[in-house]
Amino acid sequence: MIREVSKIKYVYELLTPRIRGAIMSVPEIERDRIQEIRLRRGRRLSVTIFSKEYFVNDNGRLMNNIGDSVQVTTEDIETIYQRAFQNSLHSFHREIARGYITVSGGCRVGFCGTAVLDPARSYAVESVKNISSLNIRIALSLIHI
């Protein structure tokens, strides 16, 4: 028999206190099934569970509509982006060019923004500015029991 174990705990350190609080308030049985956390600047916090998107409020309630769900700010996006890159963007050129970085526990943080190209390197992606959204994919461990 195989059991899946979520590695969501590895992304808590990346999240801002407000976003972390909302995610940690989701009941554990649902929280462990989260596959993605979606953060879009100026839009509502959402999570994906079994390919279905839910919005999350401050109390961790999962909702099918926006309702009183948490609104993601520019500060949330910038802080989480910087934490994913350990405040050292210049050390991660390859990851920036790919559009995602693998963080602790095998989780991935994908990002969307405006590419800054380097003409000296055949217009390779040098950096990304104006980050507008982040998608955190939660890794799973398969445990044989």
Question: Which residues are covered by each model-predicted region?
Answer:
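Conserved small/polar residues in nucleotide/adenosyl-binding loops
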Residues: 143-145
